[in-house]
Each structure stands twice: as structure tokens, then as C-alpha cells.
Amino acid sequence: MEAENHTTVAELIILGLTEDPKLCIVFFVIFLGVYIVTLVGNISIITLIRISSQLHTPMYLFLSHLAFVDILYSTSVSVIMHMELLGHGLALPVAACAAQLCITVSFGSAECFLLAAMAYDRYVAICSPLLYSTLMSPRVCFLLLGMSYVGGCMNGWTFTGCLLSLSFCGPNQIDHFFCDFSPLLKLSCSDVSIIGIIPSISSGSIIVVTVFVIAVSYIYILITILNMRSTEGRHKAFSTCTSHLTAVTLYYGTITFIYVMPKSNYSTEQNKVLSVFYTVVIPMLNPLIYSLRNRDVKEALRKATVRVYS
């Protein structure tokens, strides 16, 4: 009977990064620039890998899919962010908010799986080079890619299913710049004791499994590199891993802080800053990390530039 006294909320209002009109304009210009760089950088990586035969290897196949995921991941958040900055807030139906959450979580989770697949690829290339063509055959590569997307979608649907099972009948203002699960949970008038735990278990499992794969891969890589007699061989092996390690450290460091650390350890504003970093900034940085610190990509870019202007 108590539920009948509540009015069901039809739409949710995303407050955004700030309510200051002047800051909204500044942030809009900054993040529009970041988004354009993200699109140009990741599309360039995908195009370069497609047109450069020397990059037709499993490592760069995974990198092209990482760039594709980064485009969709960033877009799912950036479009809503720009709309709310222009309108000083944004009203979305609950279903639209659930769809945005599903897309963001799906591609964010797929990125975790892709980073783990890339670590395994580096492990095979450095520790078992003679078996590389067998262990990283096209069939294995597409299986790893399929698992990445399916695993990401399953986590996305877990979050979405939990969100759609909640009732919203009180305050409807989300103190965030996109439909993230934790702020939505605070607005619900349902019992969230179990619903609130399920997404944490799902995301936590993905983080633990993928970090385990990455850590074990790099432990074996480090042992193999330290046993190499050639200094040049060590340097070459290290250089193929530094870009990936940088991307892993940035991404996992941020999402672990947000989703694993107790919420009492940081404020809502700090949560927004960290969320901006892993949803908007990191997708922009990944192409720069993999192009500026990768000899093969730089060489392929040089050849492509020569072909264009010759």
C-alpha cells in the first residue's frame, strides 16, 4: 500500500559537471575539442592498421578494436555531456538512461577484456615466438575478440537489468554528467541491498580476471626478458610492451579507484573528475600512447604519408 502513495518518476535530470553558466561554456569547448581529437586519433589508428600490410598482425588487430571500442565508449558519454553543458542540465527518460548505462558499461568492460587479450598476445610473442602463428591464429584472435564483446555486453545487461528493476519515486536529479549506476542507486525508492551488490560483483569479477591475466602475462614476459643475453633484444621486447602497460595502468588505476575503493574515501566532485578521466580523457590518450611510443605505427604512418604526398 505504501508504494501506491509514491509518484513514479518518468524521467531523470542529469545535473552535469557544473551549474555555473560560464563554466558550462568553457567545459563545452574543452570537451568538444577532446572528443574531436578522440575521434580523429582512433579513426586514424583504425585506418592506418587497415591500409598498412605490416600492421596486419594479431597485436594490431586488437589495437584496432580497442580504438573502435574507445570511439563508442567515449561517444556514449560525450554526447550526453555536451547536451547537458549546452542546456545546463538534461532530462532523460528512465529507459534512455538505462540504454546509455548499458552502452557505457558494455564498451568499458569490453576494453578490459581487450587489454587482457593484448597482454596475452605480448606473452605469446615474447615467451613462445616459435608457436606464435599457432597460438595466435586467426581463429584464436576472433575467439578472443568475440569473448571481449560478449563479456562486455553481459556486464552491460547486468547493470541495465538491475537498473530497470528499481523504482524511482522521489528525487530525480542525478548529481553526475552521465547515467552512472551509483548515483542512480541513491535515487531509488526500492530495496537496493541486493541489487546494489550484483553489478559490483559482476564488474569486480571482470577486473580480477583480466588483471590476473595481465599480471601473469607480464610476470612471464619479465622473466623471459631478464633471461635474454642480448641488450638489443631486451630493449626491443620492452618497447613492444611499454605502450600497453601505460594504457593498462591509466585505465585500471582509475576504474579500480572508482569501483573498488569505498565511496566514503572521496567526494562526488572527485568522482566526477575521475569519471571524466576514464570515460573521456583515456580514449583520447590511447591513440597517442600507441602511436608516439610504437616504432611500427610510426613507420607505417610515415609510409602512408609518403604515399599520400608522392
Curated annotation (Swiss-Prot):
Which InterPro entries does the UniProt record give?
Answer: GPCR_Rhodpsn, GPCR_Rhodpsn_7TM, Olfact_rcpt
Entry's Gene Ontology cellular component terms: membrane; plasma membrane
Q: Name one GO biological process term.
A: G protein-coupled receptor signaling pathway
Membrane topology classification = Multi-pass membrane protein
**Superkingdom of origin:** Eukaryota
Subcellular locations according to the entry? Cell membrane
**SUPFAM superfamilies per record:** Family A G protein-coupled receptor-like
Q: Which residues are glycosylated?
A: N5, N265
Which residues lie toward the Cytoplasmic compartment? 47-54, 121-133, 218-237, 293-310
Q: What is its main location?
A: membrane
Q: Which GO terms describe its molecular function?
A: G protein-coupled receptor activity; olfactory receptor activity
Which Pfam family is one of those matched by this entry?
A: 7tm_4
Q: Any idea which UniProt keywords this protein has?
A: Cell membrane, Disulfide bond, G-protein coupled receptor, Glycoprotein, Membrane, Olfaction, Receptor, Sensory transduction, Transducer, Transmembrane, Transmembrane helix
Residues assigned to the Extracellular compartment are 1-25, 76-99, 155-196, 259-271
Q: Which residues form a coiled coil?
A: none
Which family does this protein fall into? Answer: Belongs to the G-protein coupled receptor 1 family.
Query: Any idea what job this protein has?
Result: Potential odorant receptor.
Q: What is this protein called?
A: Olfactory receptor 5P53
